[in-house]
């Protein structure tokens, strides 16, 4: 199920700089919640395994089934929206998982995703948006009045932007030390840019839902791109400083304007 991944020199350099000792594992299958047998297999590769759980009180009454399962004691790594490369500090040492769904991805971009995960796992940040919002997730749902699935998608995007505010300067600094990874980060941003300028019109005409637009815009924040109103307000020191409180206030004000 799990095999230690051979890392190219630049990705090994990122690990040495940010997450010394972290394991990077290739996975034979896709998974989120690990069955007991696979969790036991994983436990043989690490010194300790301590699954995280969260209070039920943090959840609004209606949430996707996977999120309700996530707050329990089952060992879960990655959730819908987290992509094929995920990380966890529920183990000692921490682990970056490269899941089977990444097969066929461009090599440079996949190596960047692994390097990005190594940078993120070294931060003192939750590995899922629920650990970021905590009880404010209920407030986010109340502020937007979106469906449970759309609220989930918006929360993923908002936390993605928050992480990006902490990581993008690291990626910018790789232009000389790790130029291949830096170029992959830049290329991913350039592919996003054409979509961003039309986002307000797409949302206004119903061609793109607000949560989907937020997903694109918040990815733009991670890449240091110019993002349109109202998402530009997330690319601020205020968001970096005030976190979930800021995100909920932004959502409430934004949806009040959308309802006018």
State each model region's role.
Residues 1-78, 257-259:
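A metal-dependent hydrolase signature that marks the N-terminal structural subdomain at the beginning
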Residues 54, 59-114, 118-128:
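Active-site scaffold of zinc-dependent metalloenzymes
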Residues 92-98, 140-147, 230-233:
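Short amphipathic alpha-helical segments and their helix-coil junctions
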Residues 108-109, 122-157:
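Post-HEXXH active-site segment of zinc metalloproteases
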Residues 127-133, 172-185:
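Short acidic alpha-helical/loop segments enriched in Asp/Glu that coordinate divalent cations
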Residues 152-171:
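An active-site-proximal "capping" alpha-helix that borders the catalytic cofactor pocket
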Residues 178-260:
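Pan-zinc metallopeptidase signature
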């Amino acid at each position: 199920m799990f095999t230690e991944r051979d890392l190219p020199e630049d990705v090994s350099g990122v690990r040495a700089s940010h997450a010394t000792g972290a394991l990077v594992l290739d996975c034979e299958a896709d998974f989120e919640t690990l069955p007991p047998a696979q969790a036991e297999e994983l436990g043989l590769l690490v010194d300790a395994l301590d699954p995280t759980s969260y209070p039920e009180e943090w959840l609004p009454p209606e949430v996707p089934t996977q999120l309700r399962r996530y707050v329990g004691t089952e060992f879960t790594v990655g959730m819908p929206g987290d992509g094929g490369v995920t990380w966890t500090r529920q183990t000692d040492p921490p682990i970056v998982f490269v899941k089977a769904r990444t097969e066929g991805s461009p090599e440079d971009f996949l190596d960047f995703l692994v390097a990005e995960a190594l940078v993120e796992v070294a931060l003192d940040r939750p590995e899922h948006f629920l650990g970021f919002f905590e009880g404010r997730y209920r407030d986010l749902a109340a502020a937007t009045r979106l469906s449970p699935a759309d609220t989930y998608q918006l929360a993923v995007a908002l936390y993605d932007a928050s992480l990006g505010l902490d990581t993008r300067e690291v990626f910018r600094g790789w232009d000389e030390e790790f130029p291949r990874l830096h170029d992959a980060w830049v290329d991913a941003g350039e592919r996003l840019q054409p979509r961003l300028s039309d986002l307000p019109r797409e949302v206004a005409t119903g061609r793109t839902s607000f949560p989907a637009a937020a997903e694109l815009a918040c990815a733009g924040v991670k890449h240091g791109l110019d993002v349109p109103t109202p998402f530009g307000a997330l690319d601020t020191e205020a968001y970096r400083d005030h976190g979930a409180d800021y995100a909920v206030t932004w959502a409430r004000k934004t949806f009040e304007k959308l309802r006018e």
